[in-house]
């Protein structure tokens, strides 16, 4: 089944909700990044959440998220647009630990419990919207929940889960974001908190094969939920040889000349998809300004 995301409202429009099935998307990220199990879970959660954040945008807007903890993973970076295209990478993809005391992948140990979550939105304006909040747990979902409450003053619940097979491929992945709309009564916030506490962990729902529709129905009940849109999501990279050529130009003529003399060419690799682009001596000469 292809990955997809749904947009919905609940409680007479006082809550907006997003839910996503991202298994194939995360498997493609894992394949391109060659991530081990714990790294796959951390990267997968970040990409899953970022895909839903991208679905909140319009037109040509885009969003980039970065999880920078003090753990061995280093940086986790993901970006998404309003059309369901998402990509991501992690600095150290071969991080893997034994299961934690709850029997789950130890994402917090890999990410670290100190550091920052940063969000950059390109909304087509002169300046980007940027927000940054501290990591509160390293579990990623809780960290983005805190980001929304603190940076955007939007009471939210964020959940993302990734299940990994013994051979490191992705068994299942998905998540949800639910947000209380501005002006909603305090009782709506309290009711949402109770609803979140009442449902099983997102990883359990994913393991049971629950669809995005079923996840939100379990959360709000069928009568209170209105689904407005269903859209596909996929791992798609924006890299190209022309884009990487611009990056090489930015290094300056001296660096380009060194590539020509020492390496008789150059090979550039995209961080996000690991696609390799080769530049001959002649192509490098043409890039000199």
UniProtKB/Swiss-Prot annotation:
Is Methyltransferase among the key words of this record?
Answer: no
Subcellular location(s) per record: Cytoplasm
Biological process per Gene Ontology, one example term: protein refolding
**Family annotation (InterPro entries):** Heat_shock_Hsp33 (IPR000397), Heat_shock_Hsp33_C (IPR016154), Heat_shock_Hsp33_N (IPR016153)
Q: Which Gene Ontology MF annotations are present?
A: protein folding chaperone; unfolded protein binding
Q: Which domain of life is it from?
A: Bacteria
Q: Where is the signal peptide?
A: none
Keyword annotations for this protein, in alphabetical order, are: Chaperone, Cytoplasm, Disulfide bond, Redox-active center, Zinc
Disulfide bond residue pairs: 237-239, 270-273
Q: Which SUPFAM superfamilies match?
A: Hsp33 domain (SSF64397), HSP33 redox switch-like (SSF118352)
Q: How is it modified after translation?
A: Under oxidizing conditions two disulfide bonds are formed involving the reactive cysteines. Under reducing conditions zinc is bound to the reactive cysteines and the protein is inactive.
Gene3D superfamilies assigned to the protein according to its UniProt record, in alphabetical order: Hsp33 domain, HSP33 redox switch-like
Could you name the Gene Ontology cellular component terms for this entry? cytoplasm
Question: What HAMAP family does the database record attribute to this sequence?
Answer: HslO
**Family statement:** Belongs to the HSP33 family.
User: Any idea what job this protein has?
Assistant: Redox regulated molecular chaperone. Protects both thermally unfolding and oxidatively damaged proteins from irreversible aggregation. Plays an important role in the bacterial defense system toward oxidative stress.
Name the chain's protein: 33 kDa chaperonin
What is the scientific name of the source organism? Oceanobacillus iheyensis (strain DSM 14371 / CIP 107618 / JCM 11309 / KCTC 3954 / HTE831)
């Amino acid at each position: 089944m292809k990955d997809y995301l749904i947009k919905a409202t609940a409680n007479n429009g006082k809550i907006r909700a997003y839910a996503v099935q991202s298994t194939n998307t995360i498997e493609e990220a894992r394949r391109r990044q060659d991530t081990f199990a714990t790294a796959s879970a951390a990267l997968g959660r970040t990409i899953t959440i970022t895909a839903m954040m991208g679905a909140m945008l319009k037109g040509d807007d885009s969003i980039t998220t970065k999880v920078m903890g003090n753990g061995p993973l280093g940086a986790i970076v993901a970006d998404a647009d309003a059309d369901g295209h998402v990509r991501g990478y992690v600095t150290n993809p071969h991080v893997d630990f034994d299961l934690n005391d709850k029997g789950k992948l130890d994402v917090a140990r890999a990410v670290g419990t100190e550091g920052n979550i940063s969000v950059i939105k390109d909304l087509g304006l002169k300046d980007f919207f940027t927000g940054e909040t501290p990591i509160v747990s390293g579990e990623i979902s809780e960290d983005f929940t805190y980001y929304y409450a603190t940076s955007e003053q939007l009471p939210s619940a964020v959940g993302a889960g990734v299940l990994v097979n013994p051979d490191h491929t992705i068994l299942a992945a998905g998540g949800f974001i639910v947000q209380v709309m501005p002006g909603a009564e305090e009782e709506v916030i309290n009711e949402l908190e109770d609803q979140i506490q009442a449902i099983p962990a997102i990883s359990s729902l994913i393991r049971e094969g629950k669809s995005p529709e079923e996840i939100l129905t379990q959360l709000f009940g069928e009568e209170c939920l209105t689904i407005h849109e269903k859209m596909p999501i996929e791992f798609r990279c924006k890299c190209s040889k022309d884009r990487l050529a611009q990056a090489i130009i930015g290094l300056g003529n001296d660096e380009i000349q060194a590539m020509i003399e020492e390496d008789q060419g150059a090979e550039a690799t995209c961080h996000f998809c690991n696609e390799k682009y080769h530049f001959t001596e002649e192509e490098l000469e043409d890039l000199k300004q």
